[in-house]
């Protein structure tokens, strides 16, 4: 495993991965099921994470709108999460952006619909009581 080397750190030493292992360890330990993490598992998880992020970014770039500008945007990632079956599990983590004004309008409409539903329920309950 030490044969595979990618990149260099600040001191000029070669590194297997580019993500900070300390951060990966903290994330892994945040799971209640994890009590200890050996170094090999940590390195493999970090490398797998890098490869996953690379795959997500590549797919999003190829299918995104920023290809002409050679740019990968958040919208490209969110669209990938919404449209790709492979990345569907990320839909809650990468939601499509929405303006606050649009969101507030949607909330008002939902509340109005709920109020109308409650009014209809109350009327039908009242009608049943009269019968």
Curated annotation (Swiss-Prot):
Forms a complex with DNA polymerase epsilon subunit POLE3 and binds naked DNA, which is then incorporated into chromatin, aided by the nucleosome remodeling activity of ISWI/SNF2H and ACF1. Does not enhance nucleosome sliding activity of the ACF-5 ISWI chromatin remodeling complex. It comes from Homo sapiens (Human). GO terms for cellular component: CHRAC; epsilon DNA polymerase complex; nucleus; pericentric heterochromatin. Residues 100-124 form a coiled coil. The modification N6-acetyllysine is found at residue 102. This is Chromatin accessibility complex protein 1. Heterodimer with POLE3; binds to DNA. Component of the CHRAC ISWI chromatin remodeling complex at least composed of SMARCA5/SNF2H, BAZ1A/ACF1, CHRAC1 and POLE3; the complex preferentially binds DNA through the CHRAC1-POLE3 heterodimer and possesses ATP-dependent nucleosome-remodeling activity. Within the complex, the heterodimer with POLE3 interacts with SMARCA5/SNF2H; the interaction is direct and enhances nucleosome sliding activity by the SMARCA5/SNF2H and BAZ1A/ACF1 interaction. Within the complex, the heterodimer with POLE3 interacts with BAZ1A/ACF1; the interactions are direct. Expressed in heart, brain, placenta, lung, liver, skeletal muscle, kidney and pancreas.
